[in-house]
């Protein structure tokens, strides 16, 4: 179904791979990209479970927008192992204005397609999504 604000559709693979991350923990992260030609949101990269947060952060381009989800494992103050799924809206200052507008107008609709997101991060610079910030948001 197309997004009324931006006219974008969400490729079914986005939802299937997210369900796999959420239920079977088949991936550590998923990076999504808007395909301008097809006018839809598609899976760009799947991060394997052995990949860490630094690997994930390195996949986000310095001058292009992306959406992503990351499955963060952490230990609580009570020494309990937990996991939270983060949604990232990556919109660097150096990205094209049209791209930033397209990602911004599609974000809420796309995020609603991914049922089970627990935290959201909007970042324009890597410092806004450091591992310390993510861990603090998880608790």
Swiss-Prot record:
GO terms for molecular function: actin filament binding. Residues 7-139 form the ADF-H domain. PANTHER family: COFILIN-RELATED. The gene is ADF9. Belongs to the actin-binding proteins ADF family. Actin-depolymerizing protein. Severs actin filaments (F-actin) and binds to actin monomers. It comes from the Eukaryota. Gene3D superfamilies: Severin. Keywords: Actin-binding. PROSITE patterns: ADF_H. InterPro entries: ADF-H, ADF-H/Gelsolin-like_dom_sf, ADF/Cofilin. This is Actin-depolymerizing factor 9. GO terms for cellular component: actin cytoskeleton; cytoplasm. One of its GO terms (biological process) is actin filament depolymerization.
